[in-house]
Regions:
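N-terminal intrinsically disordered/low-complexity leader segments
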Residues: 1-21, 32
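A short small-residue
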Residues: 7-12, 54-56, 84
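Residues at secondary-structure transition points
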Residues: 13-17, 21, 63, 67, ...
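Solvent-exposed, amphipathic alpha-helical segments
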Residues: 25, 29-36, 82-90
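Helix-turn-helix
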Residues: 25, 33, 37-67, 71
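Amphipathic alpha-helical linker/stalk segments
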Residues: 70-92
Length: 92
């Protein structure tokens, strides 16, 4: 679920990685991994494989698996708040 700005900046195989895009792709893969397998079953190796990065890159951006999970929770809460703010509740 990359937003339009991120999708427009998708890299080609021969270009250098955009650090912001790389972090976002790791986060998106982690959202799916944690949703599917839970915090204990999620594997950073699988997230790294999905994003063509390494575990070292994940730890560079998020510090630890726990830090990555925290970022996933924060992103999900951000999305929920964005959806809530788009609701039209004036008539209630």
């Amino acid at each position: 679920m990359l937003d339009e700005n991120h999708a427009a900046r998708r890299r080609t195989r021969n270009s250098r990685r955009d650090p912001e895009l790389t972090r976002w792709e790791i986060l998106e893969a982690a959202v799916q991994e944690f949703a599917t397998h839970g915090p204990r079953g999620a594997r950073t190796e699988d997230i790294a494989h999905r994003t063509n990065t390494s575990k070292r890159m994940i730890f560079y951006y998020f510090g630890s698996k726990e830090g990555l999970y925290r970022a996933v929770l924060e992103e999900n809460y951000r999305r929920i708040r964005a959806l809530e703010s788009s609701l039209r509740l004036d008539h209630l």
